[in-house]
Amino acid sequence: MEEKNLHVEEGALKVTKLTLYEAVAIIVGANVGSGILGLAYSSRLAGWPILVLWLAVAGLFTTFSMLYVAESALRTKKPLQLPGLAEKYVGKVGSVLIFISVCANSIGCMVAYTTGSGNILCTLLGLPNWAGSLLFTVPCVLVVWFGLKATGLWEKFMSTGMVVLLGIIVIASFLSGKADVSRAVYANWTYAVPLLSSAIFCYIAQYAVPELARGMRHTPKKLPVAIILGMFITGVLLAVVPLAVLSLTGAEEVTQVATLAWGQALGTWALYTANIFALCAMMTSYWAVGGSMLTNIVDMFKLKDEKDTKTRLIAIACTVLPPFILAYAGLVSFVDAIGWAGTFGGVIMSIVPVLMLNNARKKGDIEPEWKCGWYAHPAVQGMIIVIFSLAAIYFCLLYTSPSPR
């Protein structure tokens, strides 16, 4: 058993060791983007308890799906990204569909981070938006360029700092004398369904699982621990921020972005702290999403060794340039199309991991030290597909319905 797991065939993607801390940091960094600052506004109608319920449900089933991918990766000798795993265990169509979903999700996220960072640095430093975006993008690209280990190290430091900043501002919110938890603790089930859709799309770290499996092949039993711990920390952070904001403002006065609410309630220091947190959140997510997309490109197009300079230049150009161009080319309709594709990708990421796991158990290369437990039962797999599909259908109906006048 142990010998089989140690026998790895390296292809274009090389084995790079990650520690448990680094793997957890990558998951938290990927999930906690600047979108966390809008959750209070999204949950204002339904109430915080319903948000927590949906975050728990979405987080649980997303974690199950991630563990399916983890076992599939550990059953494969050669380190592969999602397209390679899908091609091996589902077929070429599955590989193409999952690559499209990865690209749509990654580009959509990086467009948001590029524009968002430009706006924040414009506010903080007085730079033009494009210059702020460039100042943000350069260090992001450098970390992605140096690969998985560099990403893990920087995620560890930056995610830790991000959590500390968030902890300071949340604690200050409750100690300010202006917070009243009863303002957040209400429930209106009429608005529950839209919030479920929002909760599901808060978790985007699924795409990073093959990278984590590649980095933890030397300690396969720690891979599920990293995934579960990373997702748990993510869920706590996603729940605590809206609670703090709604406790300060109430549903009637909550702002679309939490930075404004904190600034109005706590003062300028909170506004700046929240903006710095938002920059950190966007940066950690950019590293995880960008690094994942880069290796997906290498895997999908079967490029030469990922460490080959020419290969890396091509892959990083394909990863970095489209988001920056889209962010400042005024192609709003195209960005909207990417958002739709990302929704479609959510459905693909609910179905393909199920097929992947079931086929990997039949024709995988090796028997791994760790396997999924009861949560790989067909009934649970069916629930994952149904929940993700319903969320996507609701999203489509919401944005195709005519707006009320």
Residue ranges and their predicted role:
Residues 399-405:
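Conserved small/polar residues in nucleotide/adenosyl-binding loops
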